[in-house]
Every structure is written in C-alpha cells, then in structure tokens.
Amino acid sequence: MKAILYSQRNEGPVPRRPTGLCAVSVAEHRCGPAHPPRSRRGKERRNSSGEWQEEGVRGRWPPKAAPAAMPSSALWAVDLFGRVFTLSTAGQHWEPCRDAQLEFKRVSAARDCCWGIACDHQVYVLVGASDVPIRCQEEAYENQRWNPVGGFCETLLPSDRWPWSDVSGLQHRPLDGVALPSLHWEWESDWYVDENFGGEPTEKGGWTYAIDFPAAYTRDKKWNSCVRRRRWIRYRRYKSQDAWAKIPSEDDPQQLPDPFSDLSVGGWEVTDEPVGRLSVWAVTLQGKVWYRENVSHHNPEGSSWSLVDTPGEAVQISCGPHDLLWVTLWEGQALVREGINRNNPKGSSWSTVEPPTSENGILHVSTGVCVVWAVTKDRKVWFRRGVNSHNPCGTSWIEMFGEMMMVNVGLNDQVWGIGCVDRALYFRQGVTQSELSGKTWKVIVAGREGDRSLSGSSFSLHSAGCFFGNEVRGSAESCGPGDTDASWEVPGPASSPAGLRGKESWKGPSHATANFPEATDLSSLRLLPLGLEEPDSADCHALWAWVSGGGCAVEAHTTLKWFTTQSGLCPSVQTLSLSITPAQTAAWRKQIFQQLTERTKRELENFQHYEQAVEQSVWVKTGALQWWCDWKPHKWMDVHVALEQLTGHDGAQDSILFIYYVVHEEKKYIHVFLNEVTALVPVFSEAKHSFALYTPERTRQRWPVRLAAATEQDMSDWLTLLNLSCCESRRMHGRPSPQAIWSVTCKGDIFVSEPSPDLEGPERRLPCDQMFWRQIGGHLRVVEANSRGVVWGIGYDHTAWVYTGGYGGGCFQGLASSTSNVFTQWDVKFVHIYENQRWNPVTGYTSRGLPTDRYMWSDATGLQECTKASTKPPSLQWTWVSDWFVDFSVPGGTDPEGWQYASDFPASYHKYKTMKDFVRRRCWARKCKLVTTGPWLEVTSVALRDVSIIPESPGAHGSGLNIALWAISDKGDVLCRLGVSELNPEGFCWMHVGTDQPFTSVSIGTCYQVWAVARDGSAFYRSSVSPSRPNGDCWYHIPPPPKQRLKQVSVGHTSVFALDENGNLWYRQGVTPSHPQGDSWEHVSNNVRHVSVGPLDQVWVIADKVQGSHSLSRGTVCRRTGVQSLEPKGQGWDYGIGGGWDHLSIRASATRAPRSSSQKPASKQNGQPPSVAGGPWQTPGPVCC
Amino acid sequence: MTDDKDVLRDVWFGRIPTCFTLYQDEITEREAEPYYLLLPRVSYLTLVTDKVKKHFQKVMRQEDISEIWFEYEGTPLKWHYPIGLLFDLLASSSALPWNITVHFKSFPEKDLLHCPSKDVIEAHFMSCVKEADALKHKSQVINEMQKKDHKQLWMGLQNDRFDQFWAINRKLMEYPAEENGFRYIPFRIYQTTTERPFIQKLFRPVSTDGQLHTLGDLLKEVCPSAVAPEDGEKKNQVMIHGIEPMLETPLQWLSEHLSYPDNFLHISIIPQPTD
C-alpha cells in the first residue's frame, strides 16, 4: 500500500486561488511523494516577507500573551447604563464586555454564547471567543455520464440529475450558487475535490463510479460504469466570534415594526442534536412570542424567527436549561409551555398559572431545571413549589424574603437577583438539589475594572435613580446630593445582606425615583451638574438593571470570591496559575530552604560519627481489617493486621505487614515486606472501602492481597500509611521525576512509576512486574507526559488538566501530600442501564418478558438486573447529579422515544421497528460526579478527547524550545498548543488545524512526526511540523490495514504503531526520513487496548486477556521485549501490573541504560534507524532535517 | 521544586553535636571521658540524655549521685525548653560541638525545675500542646482527639518518629478554609538580655484588613527593641531552629512549618555577633 498525498489536483475548469505563495513544496522537505502538492487548503498564507502566518487564529506566533478568552463560566449583567459586564466564577472583578459601543437592555447567557437585546431593540448574539473556530462544510457533487463519443462528460440524460447537485441529486447546486448564510461568515478556502472515499483514497480526481444514478458508488472504474460523480467541499467559518452579531428581525414591511422587548435562551439539556442546540425565545413590544429556529453550535445565529401563538399579551419570557418555559402576561398571570421535548423543542400548548395574589400580578419569572422563581408587581419574590418536567406548572407559590427588581435562575438552579432599592446584585446562597429555595441573599461586591474612570464621566446616582425607575414612588422635588447620600447610606449595600433588612428600609426613605421615559440618550446625563456626581468612586457600587446566570456554573465545591473586596494579594494565597506562583518563588521561602540546608550542613557534616541520642525503635501499628481470602470459596474474613516499621540509624526504613487470620480454629498469618510491594490500589466497589496490594509474585498470579476497612477514614489512614512506608523503604519523596511513567486505571486512579536505569537496558532488564507504582491524587481517563516534566491529563468528562508539580491529594492527606499545588478536581460520567420489553399480540410491547428472557431492567449484557432504584453510582466517591433520562445517542440510533428494536435478545439492534421485531430496549443514563483533590489544574476553554506531547531524548533538542503538544477536541478538531514549556506547562492557546472529518487520536514523535487517526478509521500524516511551524503543512492520507479501522496511533523516535478497533497492534513498515509515511502496516499482536511508544522507540501497551496463575486479567501493563534497531517490532511481551489498567504513557522515559560493551553499534548499517537501547545515535532520526 | 513538607522534615531531623563533660568539682572514682552525642533540636535535654547519665554514673560513687542537671558557660540549662531553643539562645555563635557541663550536685533550685521522671516531661509537653491549641483553635482540635492520639504525639517525640508524630500533629496545623489562618499564633520570644523569661501575647496571623501578618509585624508589635530601625544597623539576630527567617515571612506559614513539636514558635533574639 502506498500513502497517497491527500491533495487537490485540479482537473477541469476549477476556479483556483493563486497558490504560489502557499504551496510550500513538499519536496523541499524530501518527504513528499511524486504527486504535485495541492495548495494548502484554508487559512494559511505567507505574507509578503515570506513569513508564515496563520489567518484568523487568535494565537500569535511566537505567542506574546495568553488570549483573554471568554471565561468558561461567568455571570452576565447589564448596568443601568446598558453596559454589559461579566463576572467569572474564578474572579472577583467585573469585566466589561468587549463591544463597548452597544448598550443593552437585556442579556441571556448560555455556556458558550450570550444573546441580548440592545437599546436599538435589535437582537444580537455574542459567541465566545475560542481557539477552535466554528466551521461548516459545504459540499456539492459533480455528476457525469459516459457516452461513446466524448467519454465521461457533463451531458446527462434528460431523466438524470443535475450536473452539479447535492448528495441526493435532487437539488441543483452549482459551486458558485452556494452562498454564505450571513455577513458573519467567511470562506476558508476555495472549493476542492474530496479524494477520501470512506477511509480509502480514490483514484486521481476523486471520481467514484456506478452503473447508474442513484446507485452504489465504487472507487474503481468497471466496464459497466456508466456514470461517475465526485464530491467537492469547501469550508466556511464564523468570523464574528467575541463580537455582538446582529440578528435580522422578521418585520413585515406591511405592518408597523414590532421591536423585541425580552428574550431568553435555554433548552440545551432538551437534546444535544445538533451539537450545541439552543432554544432562543423572544417577546415583542406588542406581546407576541417568537422562537428562533435552528440555533446550534454550528449555526449560532439560527435561521429564522417563527411566531408562536399565545392566548394573551406576553411581556417577559424565561426558558430553562431543560424543558421549562414560562411567560408572563400583561394581566399578571403566567403562561407555561407544555409538551417541550427533544422531538418538539417548541412545545405544543400553553397552560395558565395564576399569580400568588390577585391584587399583585406577576412581573417577572425565571425558570431553571426544576424551579421557577417569580417577582410580583409589589416586588415580592416567590418560589414555585413542585415544578418538574412532568408538572411544568408546579403546585403552589411560596413567598421568599427580600424584594427584588428581577431574579434569574442559572445553571444548577442557582439564583441571582437585583435588589429593589439598592439595585445591587444578590446571589442566593445555599441552593442545593435538596434545598432548591436556598437560604439567604448575599450581596455581590465584586469591583469593576476601571470603576474610577467610568464614574468620572457619567456616573450619577441621581440620574440613575430617576432614569430607570419604573414606578413613581416619591417625588423628585429634592434631588440634592445630601438626599442621594441618605438613600444610599440607609440600605448600606455592602454591609447587610438584603435578606436581613426590614421591609421599612426596603421601601427606602425619600428615594429619588421619577418616572422618566425609557429613552437612552446617555449624553444628556453628562450635562448634569458636577455636584451631583459621587465624589468618591470607591464607595459607590454599580447599579444593575439585568442579570443572567445561564452561563454561570456554581457548584458545591466552587469557592466564590465575589463577596469580599480584597486589596492586594496575600502572599500565601494560592493563585490558580501554574506559571506564576508568587508564594512558591517568594524570597523568604527560598531563604528558609537555603538556610535550613546550610544549617544541616554546618551542624551535621563534621559530626556524622557522633552517636544518636535516641535509639531507633520498632514501631507497630495494629488494626482490624477484612481480607479477601486466597482460597475458595473466596469471602471477606475478619483479620488482625500489624505493620511493623523498623528504622535503621541511616534512616532507612524497613516495614513488614502481618495479616493474622483464623482458619479451622487455627491461628495463621501471612506477611508482606513493604519493600516488595509494587502497588497499592484503592478499590471502592461493593460499598466496601478496600484496597489491593500487589507484589511481583501477586502480580504474576493476577491475585493481589485485598483488604477492606470499616470506614473510609480508616481505609484512607491505612492506605496512606502503607504508601508512606512503601515510599520510605524505596526512599521516594516528593514529586515524581520528569522521566516518570504515568498510568491510569479504569477507575480513573493515577499511578506513576520511576523508571530505573536498567528498565530499558539491553541485558538484565528489570522485569516489568517489579516496577513500583505509587498513586497520585486526582481522577483522569488519559494521562500523557514528556521528559521535561510537562504532564497533561483528560478526565472522563473531556476536561483537560495540567500537572502542577505536586503530589498527594485524594485520599492522601498530611505528609503524603504536598502543601501547595494540590487543588480541587472533579469528573463527570454517566451510568447506563437498559429497559427491555417484549412484544405480545394482545398488549404490544410490555415489560412482561418470557421466563427465559433477561431482566426487564438490566445492564448492557442483560445478565445483571439494574433497576433505576437499585443502581448505585460507580463507587462511594461518586454522587448522582441528575435524574435518569433516556439516552438517545446510543450507537445505531433510536426511534423518537429512544427505543431500539431486535428480533430477540441478545441481537443486533436497529432504530426502526419492523415486522420481525419482537423485543426492544432503550438506554437510560444518569449523570454522576466525583469531587476529589490532586496536583492538577483545569485547562479551560476546549474539552479534549486525546492529547500527545512530544517525547524528547535528553539533549536531542534545545531545552529552550517550546514543547510541541497536539490534541484532539471532543468534537474531533485537531489542535496544537502554543507556548508550552517547563515553566508554563499549560501553554498559551490552541491553534486549530483544519481537517475534512473529525479525528479521534493524535501522536507526535521525537522529530515532530505527527500522526493522527480520523473517525473513518484511516490514518493521516502531517507534514513539515517543526518548532518554527508548529501546525505543519498538510495532511497525507494513509489507508488503514485492510478491513480494519484504526483507533489510536503512537509515534516514538522512529517507530509508528497503531491500534485498530479489534485490538490488533500494527507496526508501520518502511518509515524513513525521506519517506515518513512508510509503506504498509505489519501485524504485531492482538488483544491490545492501548499503545504508547517512547522516545527510545520502546513499546508499552495495555493488554487484555493476560493469563495469571490465579485469574485472567484485563488491562495489564506490558512491555514489548526484544525491540532492537533491526527489529523495531520486538519479539514478545513482559507482563507487569494489572488488571484494571486503562492507559499508560512511557513517553517521558528517555533514560538510556549505560551502554554495554557487547552491544553492537547496529545503527551504522546502511542507514537503518538507530538502535533502540543503548546504541549510539549517529544517524539522525527520520524526518529530522 | 522543594516542597514545604521538606521543611518539616528538616526541622524534625535537626541535630546539635554536643560534647558533655563532667563538672570538674564532681567527685569521680576515675577520670570521666567526655561524651559525644547528636541531640535532636526538637526534643528536651532530660528526655534524650539517658546515655549521658549512664556514662558518667559509671565513674562515680553511688552516694554522690543525685539529680542530673546541665549547664553551659555558667548558665543552668532549662530542660523544659526545647534543645534547639537553648542552643540558639545561648550558644549559636560559639563553635561546634556544643560543650555542656554535667552536674550531679548543687541543683540550682531557683533556676531549674526538677525532672524526676519522663512523666513530668510528658505532662509539660502536653500542656504546651494544649495551650497552643487553645490559642489556635480554642482547644477544639486537641479536645476532639482521643487519648491514644495524645499518646502518639508524645511517643512520636520520645522515639524520634517523624511519621508517627506528624500523622497526628497535622490535625493541629489545620484551620478552616474560610479563615486565613489560626485564631492566634502560639509563639514565645526569648531574649538573653532581659530578666523576663519570654514574651507571649495574643497575636493574630491576619490583620483586620485581610493582610497576612509577617514575622516583622509581630516583632514590631510585641518586641520593638528587637527590630532594627529602617536605616539603623542590625543589632540583633532573630533565630528559629538555627536559621534567620526574613522578616517578610508570613507568620502563619512560620507557625505551620517552624513550630516546635509543642506547637509553639520559639523565637530567639540574640545580639548580632560582632565579628
């Protein structure tokens, strides 16, 4: 098989952009095949000076500063002057919104965007800035028919499709007729031909052949191929990110314009198809309700407004994250939308809810997932009891304390409000799933950036009060400064929370509110006499008009810094940034470290021969645990344990763990030398707090010593103590070395092993099962490391994390944990159960199965009964954070109610019911969350699926260079990280690398060879990646092994290994510096779950079905043996720790064993890749220039 | 990167090389050889000198032996002060090893407390720990501990077992997440130049405006004479565990990391050596 240059070859009259400046010749790099290179599609261009530039990407190269991306979680608010501000959950200052030109009345935020109504009554959407662009593929098909005269030509039969059409052929689609949907989009490149046909490269020109339209197309032209077609693609990109983009209104020119007056976004939990779908609802001044169609991540503006009939005149609307939609009517009642579901996000009908009291109608409502809050016309705040999906109207109103202008329910049903008198922003404290109404209102006193300058020009209490007051409450006859002062002193915005204030003071003294018209001419305000202005801006606080928490995630473990003003940073306050930790670098700390070292030297160096005053003693800790006995029938039995610790004079510690048990009334014991223990693994299953203890022998048996404690604290104490003793006896302290081997178990626990120098030695290798693994706090699915100490992880919820250099956390407290650098970490995953039904002729599908059938509520295999009530979170560390919901995203698709059909259990399921289907099932999912601690910090902005950091051989590269890091986003975008270094392991920003389909895996080798795997199972090689050109040049398509779909790739120094979906491990044959794509795949092994190739081309895998003397294990760490320069595929496997391991990274381990004399300098032979273990590196690696 | 945890280890394993010589007037049967020992800085003299006692008793007549006491350059050494404090305060400028004179006669009743058994040291140590926790947590942490935890603290010190001691002691070093530190910092400031044994006052780790107090703040407040004026010459050394932390060091951090096992910061103020 030969790699085909994945490129455009221009055939026919195709408009083509002048490409001279961007066609970086592949030949220059001596690695391209003979085909002419296609112009690099997309955004890359060279400027006039020949420098390479990336267009439209936020990151500069070299990066100068971190881009100020929209905070991932922020509260949005509008002040009385229409200025929009955001307050990050991590910050304590309001940031003004970018587009300062526009003034807004209303905003409604979601996670990634914010919709608003500006003072011009137009609707705008602001899509948050992201390193990953929003890009959409447009496609068109060119169809041709063969005729005996001219061969294939555009002349089709009259009955045929259009010569240029969509995929179905029904729609005419000429290339120049495909237009951009709005001004906010731009084309990324010109049209080009897609030469990838289902993972296989096509012949020249991308043509696929068939007997007739419409039919099955093949790559090969046959004698009966009468028609052919090819696919043209072109990308458009949303260019108005981080700016307010105007949404055109649907005014009928026949009628008077009806401007929008309120708007609300939500509904993202109704369905995630398409990705990022949102419900956007709006209300006009005439009281009509509109719904914005087709708003999603890839179509942030939506397509059109459609009118939704209402039984009354609407004034305000609120759409919750799920299926709640409430509208307030002019008359004071509320309308509740019924029938909103994933198939009908607009809902079907309205029902009416009466206000709490007949004299005061509802002024404002706000909905969450299962709460509704309202404000009535007398400014009282109400909580609606009993609201949920099944009963969107709820049951009754409860009056809450405080008086508010408005309230807003955000993520997790958290609530914010704007105080009625002081116009301050309040956060409802204590809102939890069990106590949705919360406890108290707490005022947010976060400062605003540049408060001083803002107030200098136009900030005036008098004007603000007059200007936006909705009702006449007092007379405006006395508006002197003294009066305004009084009205502010009494409520005391920062001193006492609203909830504590009496009603009398809420009404306020002679508060200067007049009924000014709602005009927005702010310039007039500036004409007010200077005397009215607040003299000291530090004392005045912002006056708010609107707040939206739809993008603001406040959870139990979030610590908010909104409620105190802090001047100056405390030196010991841990700042959440890795690159700058002032506390770490403080001079006083350095001095203490240094002086202690000097003191020890001074007082001990010359006196080592002195006797110690305190004789070392044996220390024994005893306790009662349970032990999973070694013999059948296996069961938990009560045992006494004793840990004996002996410390020698040199400080070396030796410990023995004794386990005393009684069998047949005979007292027996087993013992374990802790210096032989290779791993201590917590096992939180079966509602028992237990852990497994491995030794080399136990590893070979696949049968660890399992011990359980009565309480979590007890288990944590024992685990910490045993871990400390193990580390002590191996003299291991502090953080892992940069060269460490990192791994993750299927439970998300993180383990790290120090590579000994003889780990990869040519002779007397350290057997894999003798490696010592110690646990590091945190919870991850993927961990990848680099020998310069940069370590990244990805959680189950795709959150990216960067290692902080600490250790401990999780259940390791006290001495086993570093003081700084340990932070809160969390992860989210879903538990799935299946509802099974069988058809019978009388009642149709019911939950009454045959006696031989599986459980009607079961796991995926059907063997275990799993009901909604009995199914527990995966372990005691996890807690439920949602209710059960139907999972529609199962492979194979479902019908509208989530069912999948089959002829019988167990069988292959399909999404439509046919005559032969007698059973059906559907998948229910429930979200659970774990909160722990560990030496990890979140890398915000983009969720990841895979990550790869360049492995480096020591001294092979200048250590001053940035560290190349590539990743795949959860949506399949290929990204490379800019600015990653030892000092800034988090890097600065992402650079997006365009692809024609979503990718799943990526790996970068020591010489910047980037390989990736696409969703269709084929591999891609990225050419010309280098430090000066971090994102490379273009993709080369590399077909997968025959009839296999690849799922992972790993590139070491010269070796490329890939893994397919059936667990086969493949080696790429024929990779050379001049031909980096190689020739063919060679099979190496089966039963492999994950592969990691290191900087010395060492090959480590996680393997399944490893036979031990006691049991068979899945997920075992294995090293490939016999890997030599002439035999890079190796010979066999050396089995290490397992099972239950899921992921491993050997890519930091670049320590070569000292070269033995018997080792032949193999690399000298005819330009072969250099030797792997111990050989001299005289020839440069492939692709290295 | 060095971690703060390493400081605890360094502090715990601090040793002072010491040479014990018998007082010349003591009556011996034969000549008493000096005895050399590495004394743990964090421990107490009478707790770690069993070997010394045995060594000198061998050369003495039984009837001449009464309670042992120690003296350095004429100053009787208080056993109830940690060893490191005694050394810093009295001998830090002299050459190593530290020459201590051993006495068995004429117990200086007005200078020293009697130490008839280890139980007395334990009682003294535990009362210090309790006093410190009263200052730090209104005694809440120490009172919630079980008897065996108290015992483990003491046994950890007595047997020089860092792990055993800190497994419990870490609980005494915690503070609520919403606070910026302890309620009050347990500290004692010693000066050789004054008659007063030590200074101890209530001092919070954080100022009213949220700033962390530093060692300098503490000294300015409770012992202004120790701090050199802005432009003046440095007259004193401020020493803890044989080192001179910068005056900018946050007091809370010092309390967590440089406290003695009795949970007090013992700060010595000694005249700057002239050479």
From Swiss-Prot, chain B:
Annotated membrane topology: Peripheral membrane protein
Signal peptide start-end: none
Alphabetical keyword list: Acetylation, Apoptosis, Autophagy, Cytoplasm, Immunity, Isopeptide bond, Membrane, Ubl conjugation
Transmembrane regions listed in the UniProt entry: none
Disulfide bridge map: none
Cross-link (Glycyl lysine isopeptide (Lys-Gly) (interchain with G-Cter in ATG12)), chain numbering: K130
Gene Ontology CC entries for this record: Atg12-Atg5-Atg16 complex; autophagosome; axoneme; phagophore; phagophore assembly site membrane
One Pfam short name: ATG5_HBR
Localization, UniProt: Cytoplasm; Preautophagosomal structure membrane
Modified residue annotations for N-acetylmethionine: M1
Gene3D superfamilies in the record: 3.10.20.620, Autophagy protein Apg5, helix rich domain (1.10.246.190), Phosphatidylinositol 3-kinase Catalytic Subunit, Chain A, domain 1 (3.10.20.90)
Modification comment: Conjugated to ATG12; which is essential for autophagy, but is not required for association with isolation membrane. Acetylated by EP300.
Keyword Ubl conjugation in annotation: yes
Gene Ontology BP annotations: aggrephagy; apoptotic process; autophagosome assembly; autophagy; cellular response to nitrogen starvation; immune system process; mitophagy; piecemeal microautophagy of the nucleus
General function of this protein: Involved in autophagic vesicle formation. Conjugation with ATG12, through a ubiquitin-like conjugating system involving ATG7 as an E1-like activating enzyme and ATG10 as an E2-like conjugating enzyme, is essential for its function. The ATG12-ATG5 conjugate acts as an E3-like enzyme which is required for lipidation of ATG8 family proteins and their association to the vesicle membranes. Involved in mitochondrial quality control after oxidative damage, and in subsequent cellular longevity.
Family to which this protein belongs: Belongs to the ATG5 family.
Subunit annotation: Forms a conjugate with ATG12. Part of the minor complex composed of 4 sets of ATG12-ATG5 and ATG16L1 (400 kDa); this complex interacts with ATG3 leading to disruption of ATG7 interaction and promotion of ATG8-like proteins lipidation. Forms an 800-kDa complex composed of ATG12-ATG5 and ATG16L2. The ATG12-ATG5 conjugate interacts with RAB33A; this interaction is bridged by ATG16L1 and promotes ATG12-ATG5-ATG16L1 complex recruitment to phagophores. Interacts with TECPR1; the interaction is direct and does not take place when ATG16L1 is associated with the ATG5-ATG12 conjugate.
Protein name as it appears in the record: Autophagy protein 5
Protein's organism: Bos taurus
